[in-house]
């Protein structure tokens, strides 16, 4: 049997044992708890002195400082260049995390390796020392177990109840001398032979400190037993929790304590309350302190230190590849810690709704209570809704949280005023102020699906809150009180109203205040860039007057865009120096992220797809643009006799064509205005991706006109210079609708011939929307659906007719795409683009 098979068998046996033990613990614990009167437990809790609780929580938080001695020993043994204060802070955070999700201490060992590897040259020795610390966590318990084996502590009652623990006790006791001998014979560092002994002493003191915390919990709930009997129960319970491999020993530890105190005649209700207080004081309080420390300890300074550390080695294999993300993970720890704290705060104060309801039922002034209850619940829900925003470092989410904290403080002050809770709210408020100053964005993008999800989640939470309050009142036999006049009558709807008012006010203030933040470069900068680097088929639309511009720092490239509904809709590809496009887009995305906007690109080519992909985008094919090769275009030949017939017909009717160069006279503009108004027929002009009839815009390029015998303008088209590849395009094409003549054909033919004479080689006839989209069954569903629209909705919008019309000029079809964030909705993105196009 090779080593690999042995390891697999050992792993299977270990998992099987842990699972079987867990099932046994759950079943036994359920049987023990089923007979407990929870109402009596709540009554016992109400009798506890609040100052005793404060002392308990302080003691629970302070007890974990002892574990920091591990890291002090480690840093001194390896001669790390790290201050004692930093060691204590980092160690406290690691140990608090390890206590909750320790898995036998392996989580803590992994975090230690990640943090301290940047402070030492000898990584191998660091791993050896951390392994020694990991094992020594058991040796302290082993030392205490020896005291039971030699009958210093009497554990006969509990050992008779749980016989299998006796064997665990003997094995663990025997482990101590082996560890001490091994650590002294083969130490990680020959100059530190007694490190194993030091760590064992730290471990022993730490277990005793935990025992003192639990004993104090027993004193608080009036569960008096002798300390010698108690310590024996605690040691066996700790061993059971350690063997179970369950984080924190949850279940196994509690079961042994419950059975042990039961044998000593302590009521189960008191034991349960004692365990709950212990879990809160020894686990929850240190985690809260660790989260607060994390919000200060692991910030931008830590990230900069790691990036500049001479010990930081680039990733070369799988392990180092994962570790290469550590600086990003560490940078997110403060916001993650604060988000968790806000989440816990929300949950705790949701539970405190019950206190307000309980007091209100016995008070004649129901109105005041039910308004305060609605405010309290609204604030708790707002805290919960903004947890993700706080993690994402959104200033708007932090402001929501700060307002919620203030509202909860007011409600707390006027109802169940508690100095502990108000102090806690003050701490969270200060942390939110610090987070607000560090925040890297004003707000997150507002998306329809997020709004719907938020509404559904809010309704669910409010419903659960109602069920919790009603169920608790029923369990406490309070439902006999008449409820029709109580605070619960209009509570739900008032809560929704308060939430809507707060969200509406803050959202409006942010949009109003920061709508002025949007920056726009000067059009002169864009003109200079186009003159130097060239343009594209859309570059002339910088003169349309409905766009803003974003340039890079060196002003060698720019984008033209427009804001709509928390999105920046960009028209076409970037313009300018292609080498600057990466820098330009990165700056633009940073700008959009800071303001909380989505970025959407409309009508881009396939030339820069890799660039857009690098920014986490996906694509949707909008259609194809018809580009005519003027070097191959001609009206001669059998296939072109239709073109010649059209031109001959206009000649017979004495309809002429000419190109008018700017500046234009007022009379000429008025003639064009007359044709444009009749052609529009009171329809609204489109914007953004096309030009509009505007004298300033039209005066930027020549205009082709067709005149009748009376020299009156009957049709016109505006030119769009592209400033690249000898190409030209047309924008507005309008004619008198009452004339039964192929005026659009006439304009196109004359423009094509004129452009060819002027030396242009390409002519852009515009896009055929949804053309050649989703034609294969391998295409995305959204594109296949768009393709069906192209085929079957020709009566609603002439998709096919437009392509057929342009196809007779034998163009080359070039695809055009919509580019949008991968976590955004296609239909929402298309909707925003259409709103930009159809509204000025």
Curated annotation (Swiss-Prot):
Quote the InterPro entries the UniProt record gives.
Answer: Acyl_CoA_acyltransferase, L-PG_synthase/AglD, LPG_synthase_C, PG_lysyltransferase
Per the record, GO CC terms?
A: plasma membrane
Reading the lineage from the top rank, the first entry is Bacteria
**Cell compartments where the protein resides:** Cell membrane
Regions that span the bilayer = 9-29, 53-73, 90-110, 129-149, 162-182, 201-221, 230-250, 272-292, 338-358, 370-390, 395-415, 416-436, 451-471, 490-510
Reactions that this protein is recorded to catalyse: L-lysyl-tRNA(Lys) + a 1,2-diacyl-sn-glycero-3-phospho-(1'-sn-glycerol) = a 1,2-diacyl-sn-glycero-3-phospho-1'-(3'-O-L-lysyl)-sn-glycerol + tRNA(Lys)
Q: Does the keyword Transmembrane helix apply?
A: yes
Query: What GO terms describe the biological role, i.e. biological process, of this protein?
Result: lipid metabolic process; phospholipid homeostasis; response to antibiotic
Annotated membrane topology is:
Multi-pass membrane protein
What residue ranges lie in the Cytoplasmic compartment?
1-8, 74-89, 150-161, 222-229, 293-337, 391-394, 437-450, 511-840
Known EC number: 2.3.2.3
Q: Name one GO molecular function term.
A: phosphatidylglycerol lysyltransferase activity
UniProt KW keywords? Antibiotic resistance, Cell membrane, Lipid metabolism, Membrane, Transferase, Transmembrane, Transmembrane helix, Virulence
Keyword Magnesium listed: no
Segments in the Extracellular topological domain:
30-52, 111-128, 183-200, 251-271, 359-369, 472-489
Per the record, the similarity remark reads: Belongs to the LPG synthase family.
Q: What does this protein do?
A: Catalyzes the transfer of a lysyl group from L-lysyl-tRNA(Lys) to membrane-bound phosphatidylglycerol (PG), which produces lysylphosphatidylglycerol (LPG), a major component of the bacterial membrane with a positive net charge. LPG synthesis contributes to bacterial virulence as it is involved in the resistance mechanism against cationic antimicrobial peptides (CAMP) produces by the host's immune system (defensins, cathelicidins) and by the competing microorganisms (bacteriocins).
Which PANTHER family does this entry report, sorted A to Z?
PHOSPHATIDYLGLYCEROL LYSYLTRANSFERASE
Q: What is this protein called?
A: Phosphatidylglycerol lysyltransferase
The gene that this protein is the product of is mprF
